């Protein structure tokens, strides 16, 4: 049975998996009669949409793309005629082109439309999700503003769009009254219609151009090929229709990138069968068409298009879903007692999902997940498990490459793979079975005075090493048994390699999905070692399958057997699959039934969908087969219980992960845009000054002649600027490290998102206005002014050809740099004022320093280190709290107000707050922690306790000075 973990909740695993339920908020209408009551009841079924600013509106009913374009009963407008005309041109082109040009031309056409889909639409949606770019374009161009107001510079375009949209939506829609977000989405829909229809049309025409019948094909194979191909196409059609039935046009056209609807997330139909059905099984028709065309060209271009669609899903849709629907839960304002926390831990199967962990000195119910084992990113050569695996992999590789592929060596490699598979399934299964019944693994370590956490860590190492050796030996055997085809065009050589690679990719994806759903705890069968009142969840791949590893999790071994076409590899694949199923039935299933009882789900989503479509006679047959299997399994278990040998296995628990230096040296290759003519701008009117109200001013130099502005790490920095009244509305201010830009007149290094616009609505990104406080406030500037107009910039001032002592008016503004717009590292920085969206520097600020104060051990009484840690811990808490608050952007929703208050939650993929804290702790105390440690500690009090103990362990090395040049990230991460 599946190792399940966590608390059950909906799995929002696909953008187009959101079904709109009738909203309970009625549209207010007077009800004066029976007709009025019926109208009110109908109003309750209306879908209510909400824009990002909270505006509520009734979402009109719209028709799907195919019905709009092809149904004669649907009204047609100019955009429909345009789409149909372009489709018709594609068809005409197929018949006009000579035969030798059809395939390359339509291959280019299809790839162009596919790029417009995945890259073009993907970029638009990415920008809309993060910056509301399309809505900002609509606001800037004012295309939805009524021309009667005199503010619309495009009245003809307004009339055209209004006519186009109102023709398509006759009910519940008013172009003038609809929110700008909804109108923008409707225009975006028309662009999507054009791209999707041309994408599919060009693909079908390419398949027609490539279609042929192999010369050696007999009639039976021809019939079979077309029957299977048509079946896949019809299945694809059903998937698309059922998906549209569930999600409607709102999710089909990515509506929640523009607005949200008042609805619940529900899953039924095709969304119970497979994850992301629109992008997984929803592309089965591509392979059906490839089969009917009997063309490898169509197959390969189908695989390429399918891979591009998955990239679109991963890079565009999934991040938006996480941000929109899987926001972290609200933070608890007061920390709970240890007992309450322990109880909460007992009810959670995924300790890594909670940041409110028990303080380090207290015992925990479930193991800490601060130092995971699975994955390349968790590779730690200081651990003997990881170093042993690397050495063994090198040994396997050397033996495989250096030995000949003679029959005797092939035999030994296959035998080695079979032995490791037996150990991985039978040996590991025996250990887990003993652990389930008698806790033998844990008892062994307790006997020698170890804890069950130590037993758990040793078990993880044993299982991880066994799994790695099992698959390494299998790959080595496959390599020995494989021979390159002499003629790739003969027989099914290419097809076997393609299908085999697909099966291997399927197993890799399944394993990654299982790990994402279970976490480290479930992956290593944690409920065999910690069984305190667990709860089940069926998220991720487990929403569709109870035991994905039973079939999909072993697809790769059959892929290797298919590629090698070797009887020995078929034997290994059969052995692996048989032992894998036996492991599930004889080890996992009994333990899960004992632990969870009736809490186990009988049928997964895919099984439920299939059962609903079966006639009653088949359902009865299925029940009889299940009973026979259950009785057979019980008999086998009784036989095994009567004779079970005892095995003893133990593994002892060796160069630190390489630190990422990407952000230490930012990219210096950028495209610098220069404004060629700056005539008409008085350079003396440009200035930029740092607000010194929050800075720490210290004397610089022995003679104390100058002052250095010093800001605390992470504290917001206010900037005041002035510019001529005629300055460009697209001016902007960027934050840079001193020394990055050799020129004072031109900036040639990217700001990495650390910039703020001087005016609202000037750039296609809402983030550009984040931090903007005031702009274009007219003030009087006393003193001299430059009348020459000739630009010359040096440190914020220009050359003067003539002067005047009279004051004059200038524009001024204020902005604040905070959060992701700071550098989050120590160093000396400056602000630069740029002109008209380009990189001409009009003014620079005074340099200032970002500094993290070192914790002074000298302020701790000498007796503390020997008699106790209480005073030192308190001192560390007091020094650390304000820095941690800065690291959390001083946001009251996530930033702790006291040392005991827990940190706010952040998503698994975004650990920026924890990385900031890690960097600050490293610079303050000379101690480097992993981000997982910060998340596990959960508050300043626990973190201070850990720092205090680390200082004792590492003394006198804990205060080694760092150069402070690196950014506070353990992984490459671009600051937005």
Curated annotation (Swiss-Prot):
The main location is endoplasmic reticulum
Name the cystine pairs.
none
Membership in a protein family: Belongs to the class VI-like SAM-binding methyltransferase superfamily. CHO2 family.
E.C. number: 2.1.1.17
- What are the boundaries of the region Disordered? 1-36, 326-366, 780-810
Q: Which pathway, metabolic or otherwise, does it act in? A: Phospholipid metabolism; phosphatidylcholine biosynthesis
Ranges per topology, Lumenal: 1-80, 126-190, 240-272, 317-388, 432-464, 509-567
Q: Which residues lie on this side of the membrane: Cytoplasmic?
A: 102-104, 212-218, 294-295, 410, 486-487, 589-976
**Subcellular location, in the record's words?**
Endoplasmic reticulum membrane
Q: Which organism is it from?
A: Trichophyton verrucosum (strain HKI 0517)
InterPro entries xrefs: Phopholipid_MeTrfase, Phosphatid-EA_MeTrfase_fun
One GO biological process term is: methylation
Q: Where is the composition biased (Low complexity)?
A: 787-807
According to UniProt, the name of this protein is Phosphatidylethanolamine N-methyltransferase
Fetch the Gene3D superfamilies from UniProt: 2.60.40.2840
Q: Could you list the residue ranges that cross the membrane?
A: 81-101, 105-125, 191-211, 219-239, 273-293, 296-316, 389-409, 411-431, 465-485, 488-508, 568-588
């Amino acid at each position: 049975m599946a190792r399940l973990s966590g608390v059950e909740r909906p799995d929002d695993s696909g953008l187009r998996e959101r079904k709109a339920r009738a909203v309970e908020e009625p549209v207010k209408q007077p009800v004066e009669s029976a007709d009025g009551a019926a109208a009110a009841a109908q109003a309750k079924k209306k879908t209510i949409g909400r824009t990002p600013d909270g505006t509520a509106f009734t979402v009109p009913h719209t028709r799907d793309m195919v019905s709009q374009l092809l149904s004669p009963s649907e009204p047609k407008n100019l955009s429909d005629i345009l789409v149909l005309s372009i489709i018709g041109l594609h068809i005409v082109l197929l018949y006009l082109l000579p035969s030798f040009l059809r395939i390359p031309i339509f291959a280019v056409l299809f790839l162009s439309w596919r790029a417009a889909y995945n890259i073009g639409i993907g970029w638009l949606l990415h920008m809309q999700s993060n910056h509301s770019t399309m809505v900002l374009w609509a606001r800037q161009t004012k295309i939805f503003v009524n021309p009667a107001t005199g503010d619309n510079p495009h009245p003809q375009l307004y009339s055209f769009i209004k006519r186009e949209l109102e023709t398509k939506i006759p009910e519940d829609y008013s172009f003038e009254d609809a929110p700008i977000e909804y109108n923008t989405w409707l225009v975006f829909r028309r662009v999507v219609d054009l791209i999707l229809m041309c994408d599919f049309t060009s693909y079908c025409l390419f398949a027609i151009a490539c279609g042929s019948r192999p010369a050696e094909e007999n009639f039976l194979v021809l019939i079979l090929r077309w029957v299977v191909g048509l079946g896949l196409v019809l299945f694809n059609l059903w998937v698309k229709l059922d998906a549209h039935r569930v999600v409607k046009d709102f999710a089909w056209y990515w509506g929640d990138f523009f607005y949200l609807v008042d609805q619940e997330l529900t899953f039924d139909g095709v969304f119970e069968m497979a994850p992301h059905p629109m992008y997984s099984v929803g592309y089965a028709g591509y392979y059906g068409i490839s089969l009917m065309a009997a063309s490898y060209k169509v197959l390969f271009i189908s695989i390429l298009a399918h891979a591009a669609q998955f990239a679109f899903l991963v890079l565009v849709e999934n991040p938006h879903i996480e941000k929109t629907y899987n926001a972290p839960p609200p933070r608890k304002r007061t920390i709970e007692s240890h007992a309450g926390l322990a109880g909460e831990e007992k009810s959670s199967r995924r300790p890594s999902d909670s940041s409110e962990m028990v303080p380090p000195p207290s015992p925990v119910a479930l193991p800490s997940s601060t130092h995971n084992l699975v994955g390349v990113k968790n590779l730690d050569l200081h651990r003997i498990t990881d170093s042993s695996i690397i050495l063994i992999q090198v040994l396997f590789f050397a033996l495989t490459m250096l030995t000949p592929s003679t029959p005797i060596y092939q035999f030994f490699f296959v035998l080695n793979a079979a032995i490791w598979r037996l150990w991985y399934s039978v040996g590991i299964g025996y250990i887990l079975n003993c652990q389930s019944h008698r806790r033998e693994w844990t008892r062994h370590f307790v006997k020698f005075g170890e804890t069950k956490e130590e037993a758990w860590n040793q078990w993880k190492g044993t299982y991880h090493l066994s799994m790695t050796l099992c698959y390494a030996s299998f790959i080595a055997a496959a390599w020995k048994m494989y021979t390159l085809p002499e003629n790739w065009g003969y027989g099914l050589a290419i097809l076997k390699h393609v299908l085999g690679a697909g099966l291997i990719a399927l197993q890799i994806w399944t394993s990654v999905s299982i790990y994402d759903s279970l976490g480290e705890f479930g992956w290593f069968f944690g409920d065999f070692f910690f069984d305190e009142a667990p709860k089940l969840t069926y998220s991720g791949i487990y929403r569709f399958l109870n035991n994905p590893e039973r079939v999909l999790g072993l697809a790769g071994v059959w892929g290797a057997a298919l590629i090698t076409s070797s009887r020995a590899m078929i034997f290994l694949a059969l052995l692996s699959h048989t032992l894998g199923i036996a492991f599930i039935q004889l080890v996992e299933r009994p333990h899960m039934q004992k632990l969870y009882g009736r809490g186990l789900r009988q049928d997964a989503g895919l099984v439920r969908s299939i059962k609903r479509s079966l006639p009653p006679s088949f359902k009865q047959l299925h029940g009889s087969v299940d009973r026979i299997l259950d009785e057979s399994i019980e008999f086998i278990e009784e036989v095994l219980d009567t004779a079970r040998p005892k095995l003893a296995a133990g593994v002892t628990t060796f160069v630190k992960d390489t630190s990422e230096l990407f952000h230490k040296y930012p990219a210096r290759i950028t495209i610098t845009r220069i404004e060629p003519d700056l005539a008409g701008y008085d350079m003396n009117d440009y200035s930029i000054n740092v607000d010194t109200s929050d800075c720490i001013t210290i004397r610089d130099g022995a003679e104390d002649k100058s002052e250095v502005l010093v800001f605390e790490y992470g504290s917001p920095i206010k900037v005041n600027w002035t510019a001529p009244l005629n300055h460009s509305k697209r001016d902007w201010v960027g934050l840079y490290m001193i020394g990055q830009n050799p020129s004072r007149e031109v900036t040639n290094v990217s700001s990495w998102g650390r910039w703020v616009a001087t005016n609202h609505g000037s750039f296609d990104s809402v983030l550009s206005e984040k931090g903007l406080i005031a702009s274009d406030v007219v003030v009087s500037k006393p003193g001299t002014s430059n009348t020459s107009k000739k630009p010359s910039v040096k440190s914020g001032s220009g050359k003067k050809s003539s002067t005047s002592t009279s004051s004059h008016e200038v524009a001024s503004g204020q902005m604040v740099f905070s959060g992701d717009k700071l550098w989050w590292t120590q160093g000396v920085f400056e602000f630069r004022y740029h002109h008209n969206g380009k990189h001409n520097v009009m003014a620079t600020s005074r340099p200032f320093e970002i500094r993290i104060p070192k914790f002074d051990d000298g302020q701790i009484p000498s007796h503390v280190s020997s008699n106790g840690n209480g005073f030192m811990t308190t001192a560390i808490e007091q020094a650390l709290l304000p820095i941690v608050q800065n690291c959390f952007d001083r946001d009251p929703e996530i930033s702790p107000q006291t040392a005991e208050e827990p940190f706010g939650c952040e998503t698994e993929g975004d650990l920026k707050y924890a990385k900031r804290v890690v960097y600050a702790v490293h610079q303050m105390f000379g101690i480097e922690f992993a981000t997982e440690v910060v998340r596990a500690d959960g508050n300043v009090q626990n973190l201070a306790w850990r720092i205090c103990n680390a200082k004792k362990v590492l003394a006198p090395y804990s205060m080694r000075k760092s150069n402070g040049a690196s950014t506070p990230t353990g992984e490459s991460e671009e600051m937005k």
